[in-house]
């Protein structure tokens, strides 16, 4: 039985977005500098620059209906729409997508390296065999993405305030990735590789985690009675966190 009703999910995500926007308005210059320094430790991102006018590949993504085997570098988009664009086997390096509308956009066999995606709209977006490497994703509601071929992999990334409510992520990867305030409620997470990842206030409830790899992962809080764990692999000392759910104290 679902832990949370499906209809409650949009309210949850709206609350997250409002909180992110409020936090951004309240940040002092010193706080913003610290956040940038924290992110750089995880991402080691390249400096974003505007594309050169004379580079044929350096065009704004979305200006073409279909792009295949193209490389996009250091492109910055803010509050623009890439509606219905199709990208196949493309690589995005050092790009920033801030509040970009990716509704019904299709990404197939694409790779994002040192990229930043902030509060992007992904209603009906196809994310099929897409790899995110050393990238930061903030306030992304993956529940809105198309279920067709949904298969994102994350390596050395930072996911902050993202939602994977009721998503199917079987056999996907979250390797050496920081999962901060990220919700996995009611997800299918069989045989997922979480090795080396850091959980910070991440919600894992009502999930199927059978066969998943949590070895060398840290910070997770998983209730064995509220999740399926058959065949999942854990390592000490983090696995000792299960004891609190059965009323056992280790001194």
State where each predicted segment sits.
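Tandem repeat scaffolds
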Residues: 3-6, 14-17, 38-251
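Intrinsically disordered, low-complexity repeat/linker tracts enriched for polar/charged residues
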Residues: 5-9, 26, 30-33, 44
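N-terminal intrinsically disordered, low-complexity tails
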Residues: 15-31
